From Swiss-Prot:
Top-tier EC class: hydrolase
Top-level taxon: Bacteria
Task performed by this protein: Could be a nuclease involved in processing of the 5'-end of pre-16S rRNA.
CDD domains the UniProt entry points to: YqgF
Family: Belongs to the YqgF nuclease family.
UniProt keyword annotations, A-Z: Cytoplasm, Hydrolase, Nuclease, Ribosome biogenesis
SUPFAM superfamilies registered for this protein in UniProt: Ribonuclease H-like
EC numbers: 3.1.-.-
InterPro entries: RNaseH-like_sf (IPR012337), YqgF (IPR005227), YqgF/RNaseH-like_dom (IPR006641), YqgF/RNaseH-like_dom_sf (IPR037027)
GO MF terms, alphabetically ordered: nuclease activity
Identification of the protein by name: Putative pre-16S rRNA nuclease
Subcellular localization: Cytoplasm
GO biological process terms on file: rRNA 5'-end processing
C-alpha cells in the first residue's frame, strides 16, 4: 500500500480503531494516539531516535498496545507551502515504515507551526519550565498533528 492522501486513508480505516500521530524530529519522535472513535488525540510517548529498526519496533509495540491500525505523520511544510529538507526526511520515514509493514495505512498531515503552538500553550497557560517543555513538547505536537487529521477525517 502506498502512502495515502487523507481521503484514501479514511477509506482504508475500519469503523472503530485507534490511529497514531507522529511528530518526527532530529533526536526524537513524538507519538500520540486517538481513541477508537477517532475523536480525541492524546499525547502518548517520546521515542528517542537510535537506529531505524529499533525505533520502528518501539513504535509498532506502542501501536499494538493501543490497538492502533494506522499512522499520521506530520509534514513540516514551509510557510509558503513548499517542502523543505524535513519534509523529505518525514516522507522517507513513511516509506521505510511501509517496507516493514506494507499494508499499514499511512498519511501525512501539514504540521506547520504545531511545535510553536504547543510551546506557546505550555508557556502561556501552564507556565512550564524550559526543561519540562523539552520533555513533553514533541509528544504534545504529535497530538496537535493527529487532532488536526482527526478533524479532517470527521469532515469526510
Amino acid at each position: 500500500m502506498p502512502v495515502l492522501d487523507i481521503e484514501d486513508f479514511a477509506d482504508a480505516l475500519p469503523q472503530y480503531a485507534a490511529v497514531v500521530g507522529l511528530d518526527p524530529g532530529e533526536k526524537t519522535i513524538g507519538v500520540a494516539v486517538s481513541d477508537v472513535t477517532r475523536t480525541v488525540a492524546s499525547p502518548l510517548a517520546l521515542i528517542e531516535k537510535t537506529k531505524f529498526s529499533k525505533d520502528a519496533e518501539q513504535l509498532f509495540k506502542l501501536m499494538d498496545s493501543r490497538g492502533a491500525v494506522a499512522i499520521v505523520i506530520g509534514l513540516p511544510m514551509n510557510m509558503d507551502g513548499t517542502e523543505g529538507v524535513r519534509c523529505q526526511s518525514n516522507r522517507a520515514l513513511g516509506r521505510n515504515l511501509l517496507r516493514l509493514k506494507p499494508d499499514l495505512p499511512i498519511t501525512f498531515w501539514d504540521e506547520r507551526l504545531s511545535t510553536a503552538a504547543v510551546t506557546r500553550v505550555l508557556i502561556d497557560e501552564h507556565d512550564i519550565s524550559r526543561k519540562r517543555r523539552d520533555e513533553v513538547v514533541d509528544k504534545m505536537a504529535a497530538g496537535w498533528i493527529l487532532q488536526g487529521a482527526l478533524e479532517r477525517l470527521r469532515g469526510l
